[in-house]
A protein has these predicted regions:
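Conserved alpha-helix/loop element of class I SAM-dependent methyltransferases that forms part
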Residues: 1-21, 37
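Class I SAM-dependent methyltransferase SAM/SAH-binding core
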Residues: 25, 31-77
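A short acidic, Gly/Pro-enriched loop at the edge of an enzyme's catalytic core
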Residues: 76-88
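A short SAM/SAH-binding and catalytic strip from SAM-dependent methyltransferases
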Residues: 86-99
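A short glycine-rich, Lys/Arg-flanked "PGG" loop and its adjoining helix->strand segment in the class I
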Residues: 101-113
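Conserved catalytic/acceptor-binding region of the Class I
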Residues: 118-187
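Core SAM-dependent methyltransferase catalytic element
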Residues: 170-173, 236-249
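C-terminal helical/coil "lid" or tail adjacent to the Rossmann-like core of SAM-dependent
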Residues: 176-231
Length: 249
């Protein structure tokens, strides 16, 4: 089971009373991998509001009547009325926000009583990758974690371990706290390992001594993958929070 399938499972996709569609906001949906896992897992009807800053979701999901693309800046309040959603998934969002606690509080606002927020983040400082040079790998990972890439405004390589502290931003109930580290044996473009390697190259680019060593390091990863010796993992942290149910009348 991969990351997105785990998130779908943690979302507890129970059909609401009366059989209406489960209303879900998938924040920073990207290509739609979490949305796809939710559609495959849900036992009943769902409506996914796929929220991102740009329309990069896969074409088949873009045209799926169960998916509603929403363009929004996640530093702004979420584009939903109060208490209209059953589930919110926030995956690798918090590190890029000006105020992660405000984000969690706003997720609380849009959830119905009894609704769930699945707050998940990779903790990039836990990156494990096979290589020929342990010392260089440690140095490059540290550089990657400490550097904000030029293509984003903010980053925090330690965000995974900070998620539980964000839960106090609103009067949520903590349902579960989980960690896992998926094992990746391939170094394909757009894989998590490939994205980390790209981040390493960007972080080292301005260091005349380190940049060529980083390039050689990535070439080593490709060689390891070709030889069947490549291994990559990073710890993911997932905190499931519930907006308390409304008191009985």
């Amino acid at each position: 089971m991969g990351r997105h399938e785990r998130i779908a499972e943690l979302s507890d996709l129970v059909t609401p009373e009366g059989g209406r569609a489960l209303e879900i906001a998938d924040l920073a949906t990207g290509y739609g991998r979490t949305a796809r896992a939710i559609l495959a897992t849900a036992p009943g009807p769902v409506r996914i509001h796929a929220v991102d800053t740009g329309p990069i979701i896969d074409d088949d999901l873009l045209h799926d009547p169960r998916v509603r693309p929403v363009l929004a800046d996640l530093d702004d309040p979420l584009p939903f009325a109060d208490a209209v959603l059953d589930r919110v998934t926030s995956v690798n969002v918090a590190e890029h926000l000006a105020d992660a606690r405000a984000h969690v509080a706003d997720c609380y606002r849009v959830l119905r009583p009894g609704g769930l927020l699945v707050l998940m983040h990779s903790d990039w400082d836990t990156t494990l990758v096979s290589s020929d040079d342990d010392g260089l790998t440690r140095r490059l990972v540290d550089k990657f974690v400490a550097t904000v890439p030029k293509w984003v405004q903010r980053a925090d390589g330690f965000m995974g371990r900070k998620l539980l502290g964000l839960a106090t931003a609103a009067p949520f109930e903590i349902v579960t706290v989980d960690t896992w580290a998926d094992c990746h044996l391939r170094f394909d473009e757009d894989s998590v390992a490939w994205k980390v390697a790209r981040g390493v190259l960007a972080a080292a680019a301005d260091d005349a001594e380190l940049a060529p060593r980083a390039t050689e390091w990535v070439q080593t990863l490709r060689r390891y993958a070709d030889e069947g010796r490549f291994l990559f993992a990073v710890t993911d942290v997932a905190v499931v929070l519930r907006r308390p149910a409304a008191p009985a009348a």
